[in-house]
Amino acid sequence: MSQSAPQLSWRLLRVWRRDWLVTRKSWLIGFMTPLLEPILYITSLGFGFRILIPEIQYEGHTLTYVVFMAPAIIATNIMYTAFMENSFSSFVRMYYQKTYDAIRATPLSVDEIIAGEIMWGATKSLMAATIMATVLSLFGLVRYPTGLGLLPLAFLGGLLFGAIGMLFTAFVKSIDMFNLPIFLLITPMYLFSGTFFPLENLPNWAQSVAWALPLTHLVSLARNLCLGTVSWMNVLVSGGYLLAATMLLVPLALRLMRRRLIQ
Amino acid sequence: MSDNVIEVREVQKRYGTFTAVDGISFDVKRGELFGLLGPNGAGKTSTIRMIYGFSPLSGGSLRVFGHDITTGWRDVRARLGVCHQEDSLDEEMSVRDNLEIFAGFFGIPRAVARDRANRLLEFFGLENREKASVRELSGGMMRRLAIARALINEPDLLILDEPTTGLDPQTRHQLWEKLARLKNQGVTIILTTHYMEEAAQLCDRLIIVDHGKILVEGRPRDLVAQFVGKQIIESSPVCEGLRRFVTERGLEHEDLGHRMLIYCKDDENIYHEITKTYCQDNCILRMGTLEDVFLKLTGRELRE
C-alpha cells in the first residue's frame, strides 16, 4: 500500500465517473461560466482598449487587441479550472467530505483516487475550453482546422495545472492556505505569461523568467492555434515543455498525496 | 480454508515514536459479531484501519479471508464493507445516488446497483427519502445510509466503527435489530463501540483493548461472571461501618469515596447482612454489567 511505485489501473476512471456524476448535478453553473467569461472579456477589454491600443505587433503579425488577447482567455481558464478543481475542490473532498476515506474502503488505491481526480480536473478544463472556443469562434476569433488543437492542449494543460494544484493539496493544513500559491504563482503567471501583452514588451531577463513558466507555453500554443500560425517548432518546444512538466509533476503529486494519506 | 475471517497476529502500529497498537493477536470467526472495545486512544480505530488495508502495518501479520492484507488488499476490500466513525457521504447528492455512485467503485453494473439500492433503501427504511439530498437527512438517517452504502457490494465482512455514537435510543435499538438480521444472513461483523450495553447485547465475542494491548477476550456474559460476578452491591453514600465491614470480611470492592461497589460473587447473604446492619436505604443489589468489567479493567480516570 505504501510502495514507492504508483499502483495504477483503469479503476481510476471510477473516481473520474464519480466526479462527473456529482458535477452533472450543478451543470448549469459549470456551463454558464465558460460561456459568459469570454463574452465579458471581449466586450470589456475589446471595447475598452480599442482606442488605447489600435493594433498590436505579435511575432511579426499585426493584430487587433481582441484577436491577440482572446486565445489567452482560453489558456488562463484552462489553468484556473484545473488548478481550482485539484486544490480547493479536491481538498474539500479529502478533508471535509472524507470522500477519499470512503473510497479507500473499496478496491481502489490512493494513486487511482488522485490520478482520477487530476484526470477529472483536466476534463473540466477541456469542457470549459470547448465551450469558450465555440463562443470565440462565433466572433471569428478561432481559425480552423488548427483551432481544433485547442482540445488536446486543454486536456494536457489541465493535467499539468491539476497536478500543480494537487501538489499544494498534499501540503496545506487548512483551505485558506491555497491563497498563498494563488498569490505567489497563479496570479503572477496570469499577468506575465504573454497573456495581456506580448512578452517582447518585457526586459530580457523577465522574458527568460516568463518562458520558464508553464502558462507562457500554454498561451503561446493557444494563440498560435487560434491564429492559424502554429509551427512545428512551437509544438515541439512548448508542447514538449508542457508534456515533460506533466510527466514529472503528475507522479510527484501522486507520491506526495500518498505520503499525506497513507498513515 | 480455516473458519477465521480475520486473523490478527502480533500486529503493531506506530506513528513516529507513538505506539498505537502494541502487538495484538485475535481471530474473528465466520458469521460472528465481534466487538472491539476500549477507551478513547486505546488503538481501536488503528486496528480497524489495518484490517481493511487503510493503514499499513508496522509489524506482525494480518490475514482477511485468507489473504495477506498487505498484498491482497484489493481482493479483501471487494468483499468487505466499512462504515466510518465520521460520515463520508456525498452531501450534495441524493440518498439513492450515494448508493449507486458508491457501487461504481466496486465495478457493479448499473442495473444491479439500482436493484441493490432498492433493497437496501427498503431494509433501512429510507425508501421514502431516496430523492432527498443527504443534507436534509437527520443524523440517524445519515448513519443508516452510511451502513446501507457499506452493504452495496454485498460484503461477507462488515466493519462498523462506532456506528451508534450520537444516535438517539430509538435509532440505536433499530440499528441493533438491523445488525442482528444481517448477522442472521451470515454476514460477519466487527464493531467498535463505547456503549457497553450495545456490546453486551450484540457481540458474540469481544476484546477490550487499552494502550494498544488486549486486556481480555471472551463472551460478554463470561467476562461479567469472571471479573465482577453476576451481582454487585452498590452503596451511595458510604457509611464508615460498611467500610469497616468490607475490609474485615476481605470482600472484593471498589471505594469511590461517595460510592462503593462490592463484588459479592453470587453470595446473596452478604447483601442481606449489609442491608440489615448498615444502610437499609442506600444499598442496592444489581446485576453486574459489561460496563463494570470495562471500568474495572481500564480504570476510571479520564482519557485524552
Per-range role (PLM):
Chain A
Residues 1-144, 152-263:
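Hydrophobic transmembrane alpha-helices and immediately adjacent juxtamembrane helices
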